[in-house]
């Protein structure tokens, strides 16, 4: 990114705060645009395009399963940060197998388990985790769910798992 002329900084805040900082920078620029997969009220178009791209990955996985004579997976485990990838994968396979979808298990990093907490609350509302989220799963340390992904996951995921680092370290 720096090689393309962008200013790159390292900030001492969590992912969600960095997203807000980047969005503010984009808003301050005459032709600024933020491109990332976290969606919030009023910022949904670009994240939906990114989720469509993730859906292409799910389509390719489904094709590979068919090539191996697996007509339908029984279970789909998918990692989640903000829930964009997870929402796209769950949405794709739910639409592919509407009468008998697989069991969907959404796996999150324990310190940032906003989707898990939203599901555990049982009221359909997303939950936010803030502050420091120390984990070896740094790319999944996102405490604010993508509202588009959350809507899919809360309606179609079978289970949510809050995964501690020791599980990840064991592979």
Where are these regions (language model features)?
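Generic beta-sheet signal
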Residues: 11, 37, 107-109, 163
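Conserved acidic residues
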Residues: 32-33, 74, 158
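Glycine-rich phosphate/pyrophosphate-binding loop at beta-loop-alpha junctions
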Residues: 21, 41-155
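A glycine-rich helix N-cap at a beta->alpha junction
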Residues: 1-25
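Short acidic loop-to-helix transition motifs that present clustered carboxylates
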Residues: 15-18, 112, 167-168
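Active-site-adjacent helical/loop segments in soluble small-molecule enzymes
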Residues: 29, 145-171
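Active-site phosphate-binding strand-loop segment of PLP-dependent enzymes
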Residues: 34-42
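Structural detector of well-ordered beta-strand residues that form the stable sheet scaffold
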Residues: 9, 34-35, 77, 105
């Amino acid at each position: 990114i720096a090689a393309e002329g962008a200013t790159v900084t390292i900030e001492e805040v969590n992912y969600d705060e960095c997203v807000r900082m980047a969005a503010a920078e984009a808003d301050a620029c005459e032709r600024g645009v933020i491109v990332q997969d976290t969606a919030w009220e009023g910022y949904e178009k670009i994240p939906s395009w990114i989720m469509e791209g993730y859906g292409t990955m799910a389509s390719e996985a489904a094709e590979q399963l068919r090539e191996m004579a697996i007509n339908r997976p029984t279970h789909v485990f998918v990692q989640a940060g903000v829930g964009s990838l997870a929402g796209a994968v769950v949405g794709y396979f739910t639409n592919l197998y509407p009468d008998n979808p697989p069991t969907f298990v959404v796996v999150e990093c324990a310190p940032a388990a906003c989707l898990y907490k939203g599901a555990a609350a049982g009221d359909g509302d997303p939950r936010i985790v803030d502050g420091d989220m120390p984990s070896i799963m740094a790319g999944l340390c996102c405490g604010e769910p993508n509202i588009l992904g959350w809507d899919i996951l809360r309606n179609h995921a079978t289970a949510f798992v809050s995964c501690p680092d020791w599980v990840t370290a064991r592979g």
